[in-house]
Structures are given as structure tokens and as C-alpha cells.
UniProtKB/Swiss-Prot annotation:
The keyword Chloroplast applies. Part of the 30S ribosomal subunit. It comes from Buxus microphylla (Littleleaf boxwood). GO terms for biological process: translation. It comes from the Eukaryota. PANTHER family: RIBOSOMAL PROTEIN S15, BACTERIAL AND ORGANELLAR (PTHR23321), SMALL RIBOSOMAL SUBUNIT PROTEIN US15M (PTHR23321:SF26). SMART domains: Ribosomal_S15. This is Small ribosomal subunit protein uS15c. It is found in: Plastid, Chloroplast. The keyword Plastid applies. NCBIfam families: S15_bact. Belongs to the universal ribosomal protein uS15 family. GO terms for cellular component: chloroplast; ribonucleoprotein complex; ribosome. Gene3D superfamilies: S15/NS1, RNA-binding (1.10.287.10). The gene is rps15.
Amino acid sequence: MVKNSFISVISQEKKEENKGSVEFQVFNFNNKIRILTSHLELHRKDYSSQRGLRKILGKRQRLLSYLSKKNRVRYKELIGQLGILEQKAR
């Protein structure tokens, strides 16, 4: 498995920032999601990895929800950089 292929230019910018920031955490969750997704394409019956993927997706969604409430501009910028679809309003 090639982990370095998912790291982009954003990682270079984020190394200088606070690792506890919401953007950095979402970026790390995004990389983990891509890695787990490629793993599950090969191992479809790996249910523990499926559960882990769902947990990470939930964590990322909660962080994005928090960011959209606190700072809409940073939220829009982040989802634009990572290529994440905007969440629908309920």
C-alpha cells in the first residue's frame, strides 16, 4: 500500500500549523478514509475495517459541522481544497 500517494501540497502547508486545528484533523481523517477505502476495495469482507471507516467518517462529519458553525469561510475553503461535498441542511 502506498501511503505517500495521498499526501498533497496541503500537507506541506499544514506541517507549519497547529496539529490540533480542525483543518489539520480533517485533512488527516481524509487521508485515513482514502487509505481504508482502497483497502476495502480489495478486502470486501473486512468488517472491522468497515466499522473503523464509518467511525472516521462520523468524526470527520462532526468536525466539519463544528467548523461550518464557527467559521463558514474556513469551512468553504477546506472543503474546496479537499474536494469534499458540502453537507445538506436538514
